[in-house]
């Protein structure tokens, strides 16, 4: 019986079919061993019986045994679900009412500390009806935008200048009595100049009347010489002005011709690229009567020798003629280019 109590925990590992028979064998084996070897050494018998019991208890289970449930690990959630203290805390947490700040004791102490009163606040917030209406009109953005849109168009600069002059004339100057303005000073200066002219003319007439005939002849010769000198200088200045104007015209014509030729060369390059892409036999049917291909003279390179100063007017005229011929793709380009090389680059 003692053996049954000791090995009761190992019976669950035995097969369900022969569990009773095996238990009887386990219970009967020690008695048989004890009877057989009662007279001899009992230690080997006990050892052999213990080995038999262990082999019966720890032998592998058969495939016919029903599967047992899988072992589930114990997690924190499973522990908290069965905890009474945790359930009591979480169940009562949602039932707590929020704190009303206005009716709290802290709010009353706060108001007392700030020394606020509803009467003073209301008095400060009250506005006069007229002030409120004026403020509303000032803050009316719609009326402001509409008024800006409906305004008259902008004045020109001349109109603004005229209005400023009218305002200057209409506005009284408080310092008129004390200090004269710039216009008054100018008028005074003009009056003084007129008086000086009159006095000089009168004095000059008196001085001429006092001169003798010989002195008058000398004065006349001096005046004629001065007139001749001034006339020659005037003619020279007019001729110089004409030369400068002509030089400017030549330079402008040269620049315009150069720009036109450059644009023509760009167009020619684009058309040449387009013609290369086209694969048709229209070139044989559409022959031109010209003796050269179109654009032959347009890409002519004009030799130029850089000098210390700018090119002269004659050089610019020759270059302008060559550029015009290049623009028109004329056959005169070789002859003009030859004349330019012989006369300008390599003069004899």
Swiss-Prot record:
Keyword tags: Coiled coil, Disulfide bond, Phosphoprotein
UniProt superkingdom: Eukaryota
Modified positions (Phosphoserine) in chain numbering: 130, 171, 190
Coiled coil location: 206-280
GO biological process: negative regulation of autophagosome assembly
Region (Disordered): 11-40, 265-296
Residues passing through the membrane, by range: none
Keyword Ribosomal protein assigned: no
InterPro entries attached to this UniProt entry: FEZ
Function: Involved in axonal outgrowth and fasciculation.
Description of how the protein assembles with itself and partners: Homodimer; disulfide-linked. May form heterodimers with FEZ1. Interacts with synaptotagmin.
Listed PANTHER family: FASCICULATION AND ELONGATION PROTEIN ZETA-2, ZYGIN
Family from the record: Belongs to the zygin family.
Protein's name according to its UniProt entry: Fasciculation and elongation protein zeta-2
Organism: Mus musculus (Mouse)
């Amino acid at each position: 019986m003692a053996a049954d109590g000791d090995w009761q925990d190992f019976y669950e590992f035995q097969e369900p079919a022969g569990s009773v028979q095996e238990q009887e064998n386990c219970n009967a084996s020690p008695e048989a061993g004890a009877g057989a070897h009662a007279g001899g050494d009992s230690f080997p018998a006990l050892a052999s019986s213990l080995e038999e019991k262990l082999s019966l208890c720890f032998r592998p289970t058969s495939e016919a045994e029903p599967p047992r449930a899988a072992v589930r690990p114990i997690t924190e959630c499973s522990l908290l679900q069965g905890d009474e203290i945790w359930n009591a805390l979480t169940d009562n947490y949602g039932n707590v009412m929020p704190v009303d700040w206005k009716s709290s004791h802290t709010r009353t102490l706060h108001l007392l500390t700030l020394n606020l009163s509803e009467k003073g606040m209301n008095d400060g917030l009250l506005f006069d009806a007229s002030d409120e209406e004026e403020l509303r009109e000032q803050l009316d953005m719609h009326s402001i935008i509409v008024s800006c849109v409906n305004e008259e168009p902008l004045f020109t600069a001349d109109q603004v200048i005229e209005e400023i002059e009218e305002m200057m004339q209409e506005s009284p100057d408080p310092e008129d009595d004390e200090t004269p303005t710039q216009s008054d000073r100018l008028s005074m200066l003009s009056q003084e100049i007129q008086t000086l002219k009159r006095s000089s003319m009168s004095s000059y007439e008196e001085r001429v009347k006092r001169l003798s005939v010989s002195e008058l002849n000398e004065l006349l010769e001096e005046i004629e010489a001065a007139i001749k000198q001034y006339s020659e200088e005037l003619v020279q200045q007019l001729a110089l002005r004409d030369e400068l104007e002509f030089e400017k015209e030549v330079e402008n014509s040269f620049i315009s011709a150069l720009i036109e030729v450059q644009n023509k060369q760009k167009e020619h390059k684009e058309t040449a690229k387009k013609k290369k892409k086209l694969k048709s036999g229209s070139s044989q049917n559409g022959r031109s009567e010209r003796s050269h291909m179109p654009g032959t003279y347009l890409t002519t390179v004009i030799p130029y020798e850089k000098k210390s100063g700018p090119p002269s007017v004659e050089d610019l005229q020759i270059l302008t003629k060559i550029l015009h011929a290049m623009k028109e793709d004329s056959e005169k380009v070789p002859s003009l280019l030859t004349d330019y090389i012989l006369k300008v680059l390599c003069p004899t």
